[in-house]
Amino acid sequence: MDFNKIEKKWQKYWEDKKVFVAENGGKKKPYYILVEFPYPSGAGLHVGHVRSYTAQDALARMKRMQGYNVLYPMGWDAFGAPAEQYAIKNHIHPKDAVKENIATFKEQMKDLGFSFDWTREFSTTDPEYYKWTQWQFLQFYKHGMAYKDTIPVNWCPTCKSVLSNEDAAGGVCERCGSAVVQKEKSQWMLRMSDYSEDLLKGLDDTNFAERVKLGQINWIGKSTGAHITFKIDGHDKKFTVFTTRCDTLYGATYCVLAPEHKYIDEITTDEHKEEVLAYKKACALKNDMERTELNKEKTGVFTGAYAINPVNGKKIPIYISDYVLASYGTGAIMAVPAHDDRDYEFAKKFNIPIIQVLEEVTGTPHDNENKKNSIVAILYDETKDKYLTINWQDKGGRLFVGGTIKDGESAYDCAVREILEETGYKNIELVHELPKINHHYYAYNKDKYFNIESTGFLFKLKNYEQDSQKLDDDEAFDVEWVDRKVINDEIKDELHAKTYQYAMNPGAMCGDGIHINSDILNGLNKEEAIKKMLEWLEENKCGEEKVNYKMRDWIFSRQRFWGEPIPMINCPKCGWVPMNEEDLPLLLPDVAEYEPTENGESPLANISDWVNCKCPKCGHDAKRETDTMPNWAGSSWYFLRFMDAHNDKEFASMEAMKYWNRVDWYNGGMEHTARHLLYARFWVQFLYNIGLVPNKEMIWTRVSHGMVLGSNNEKMSKSKGNVINPDDIVNEYGADTLRLYEMFMGDYQQDAPWSTDSLRGCKRFIEKVIRLKDKAIDKDELTKELEVIQHKTIKKVSNDLTSMAYNTAVSTLMILANEYDSHEFTKADYRLLLTLLNPISPHITEELNEALGYEPLCYASWPEYDEAKTVESEIEIGVQVNGKVRGTIKISVDEAEDDIKEKAMADENVKRHIEGKEIVKVIVIKGRIVNIVVR
């Protein structure tokens, strides 16, 4: 068969008959399927596009057969940096580049037989479309949701444009990969942070995949804590920090401000000004990722100023450090080095006090415990790489040196004394004092319960000089040097095991426990202490409970040509004034020079005829905004426009939006979870709040697909030479084979490597389906003997296509085809196979169906299964004689046990093996086997 000829034939048929055109209204139930509309790059469609588009196309085709009015539209996300950079690289105007690339994409999509409703096609670059993007921006502005502010922004020196936080994730430009730097610029912003809680709550009204929900939850980054106000010693200034652990305030021994903090210049003392200024300049050259990298060396500079810890009145130094960002939280932190790794490293480097205010609790509390303070001392022999232990055998097992601190004795002196008394070693050197632990235990040698506060120490042995032990009468143990394996295997006591853990990982104690060194909080657990500290802060008017969100406002300006012009005018008398809505769209001027400028301004700033205008409010000479919108603007609402694509009175009528209700099934990349999808949800929630859309969430199900990798499991790229061009595959194997293979290649939600062998296997399957046509008996009735497998297949394929299990849907169809190949089957049976395969491989199934004389499958009904018929009514089981299989019998699934025994004994081969022998017993294991025991 000529696959290409067949495919062109049916593509023309579908287009001529307008098979896939969706109507707004009618008796059919609406179902809206959407795949992210692509940026039409110069490279054309790739096999990753084919995977996601085929998956949604299969769902759309099945839903149409099930009687739904399916909207499956396609358009073009063509504004923004990608199109502009392609145009610059190829010396072509973005408008012309987009037009050419769209034509290529569209031809490729049609060649693959995707059932898009092309009557609703549009591009974000169409003035008829971006008129409404501009109109919606004006609604943001008029409702106080759009504002202009001078802020530190992410700047890409290569693209010469501002990037949103989402576009600069990881500290690099999402588009070109260049390192992002910080710049102060005046930018249009949307108050997206005002919607943080609504965006979190709105997830409950969606059916998003769990990993998609989690991605959004993490990006929004809600945390509940407290704002605490610190006075600056010698100044009338105050600053606020946000912390989730206000209960650790007693342990705050310094504060850190972002280098950009507004008070830095004012509070820095004269002797520190030069160093602080140099540090600030160095920070300005770093991006956020570089500044907050956890593994980098901690840097900072003392300002010479001090803050007052509000809970104890102590003066604590104020530093600046690059790991604190002005754009996150309040731009200031309180540091509790005993309980935060980063604070601990910083404190160690700058010799800042470390005060432990939490101690972990080990052991089990008991009544009538004796209280005392004690130590656990770990002695390490560097030469032999072994640790000193005390082995109490069955009276307590293996432990480290431990003991009670005497009155007037320090914990350190106690540790030295106990090592000497219990082991005789006297030449030791302190390595670390370890965090205190609150421990409950039973002392075997004293037959008492104790609650102790234990201080741990790690020492190293300087030499082997040893005195005799000084032991109490009840102390009987062996002193043994052991390696780490023995310690890990044999030290079971919680206190000693925890002390060893601290010794192996010295630093901050980041777990929870009870409070110490905390005055009013001593002895309280985390929850109790937070509650009490919040009450204290509010009573003393130096803090309050606060919910914080990581998500910032949306940076909405771009210093580029190829984007929607922002419809705002700057008047020297009136300030910023919105354009009159009736004057929209504000068109991009037709210019020859569109490259980004060296001074960081948009190229539009150089077009005086376009920039200069009159103020809509007072008529005075004014200037247009020359920044353009980000490429995310047009994609934030495009799914609404598809509902009513030709409306020139409004972006979409409420009637049309209520009819379609919302997107039932939306497929897109996981990389867009914290960008496009979050922006779109914010945009819709705003429109809902001003009464312009019917639902607060206009997307119900959101799913994501895995990438198609090269055959070596690497990401496809031109530089690696592993890019697969779908045009080549279509020309050699046909669109149906490519579609089938991409659905069969693996779990749809996971990355999958390309395999030409598997592609050929899919071609062989289609060839088998073709061959089966000539075996079909000319009858229009389904074959009774095939009833169970047919109903099983209908059920499996139907469920798989709605749960993204496309690979198992294909394998199920392969099983059905194999079953046909080994049985007699009718035309009706064959058409059933074609119908179930049609959503994935539509062209060849239409052709084979037509050859049988049936109406086209695009008008057919999807087969329904009967649950009762998905269960085998008759099964085959084995018959054993003394454990060896001697025959098989067919039985009904509910056959009586006596009847099963009778059939087993009647089998000819079984008869021969039991003849003349005594039957001891007959065992029937229902549905599996019969075992006859003879002698």
What spans do the regions from the language model cover?
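Basic, alpha-helical terminal appendages of large translation-related enzymes
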Residues: 1-30, 273, 351-355, 360, ...
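NTP-handling and nucleic-acid-processing catalytic cores
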Residues: 3-11, 47, 132-359, 832, ...
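Residue patterns forming the tRNA-binding/recognition surfaces of aminoacyl-tRNA synthetases
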Residues: 9, 13-17, 88-239, 246, ...
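N-terminal catalytic cores of NTP/NDP-binding nucleotidyl/phosphoryl-transfer enzymes
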Residues: 23-92, 98, 121-136, 243-244, ...
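Helix-rich, typically C-terminal accessory recognition domains appended to large enzymatic cores
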Residues: 77, 142-154, 544-574, 631, ...
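Alpha-helical recognition segments enriched in aromatics with Gly/Pro capping
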Residues: 305-311, 315-326, 611-750
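N-terminal strand-loop-strand
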Residues: 360-400
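Unchanged
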Residues: 405-495, 505-510
